[in-house]
Curated annotation (Swiss-Prot):
Location in or out of the cell: Host nucleus
Broad class of the protein's primary localization: host cell
Record-level GO cellular component terms: host cell nucleus
Catalytic activity: Couples ATP hydrolysis with the unwinding of duplex DNA by translocating in the 3'-5' direction; ATP + H2O = ADP + phosphate + H(+)
Name by which UniProt lists this protein: Replication protein E1
Top EC class of this enzyme: isomerase
Top-level division of the source organism's lineage: Viruses
Family annotation (PROSITE patterns): SF3_HELICASE_1 (PS51206)
SF3 helicase domain sequence ranges: 23-152
Chain positions recorded as ATP binding sites: 49-56
GO BP annotation list: DNA replication
EC number of the protein: 5.6.2.4
Gene name, Swiss-Prot/TrEMBL: E1
Keywords: ATP-binding, DNA replication, DNA-binding, Early protein, Helicase, Host nucleus, Hydrolase, Isomerase, Nucleotide-binding
Source organism: Avian papillomavirus fpv-l
Length: 152
């Protein structure tokens, strides 16, 4: 990762944000390290909470810092919407809604577990690759409501 072009005091802003959100900094760093290494069953982080709490701002900043890609569930009808996963170090799916959670639960379980997946690529043969670490943001927490409960 290219950290030469970053703000030297940027970590202080992150610390302030995490403290404001009542997140233990040491625990977060430990989880982030496992996430970046792509450890099985530890390769997906979901940031869920109330609207306008800074989830997306934090996630976009982190993905930009990591030179990652942003995926949009709105493009999920295309066979190629996951193609950026073949070329990035980390990826973000922002604002995961209930239909997106259903899709993830049905079709992306191997990706979330950090296992190899097959991705259709435009003008190329399908590519089998290990899914990069995924970061998801959502106003809906499936741990509280369940994926198929219809609540939100």
């Amino acid at each position: 990762y290219d950290v030469e072009s970053t703000d030297e005091d940027g970590w202080k802003k992150i610390l302030v944000f995490l403290t404001f959100q009542h997140i233990n900094f040491k625990e977060f760093i430990s989880i982030l390290c496992m996430w970046l290494k792509g450890r099985p069953k530890k390769s997906c982080i979901t940031i869920a909470g109330v609207p306008d709490s800074g989830k997306s701002m934090f996630a976009y900043s982190l993905i930009k810092f990591l030179n990652g890609s942003v995926l949009s569930f709105a493009n999920s009808k295309s066979h190629f919407w996951l193609q950026p996963l073949t070329e990035c170090k980390a990826a973000l799916i922002d604002d995961v809604t209930l239909p997106c959670w259903d899709y993830v639960d049905t079709f992306l379980r191997n990706a979330l577990d950090g296992n190899a997946i097959c991705i259709d690529c435009k003008h190329r043969a399908p590519v089998q690759t290990k899914c990069p670490p995924l970061l998801l943001t959502s106003n809906y927490d499936p741990r509280l409501h369940g994926v198929d409960s219809g609540g939100g």
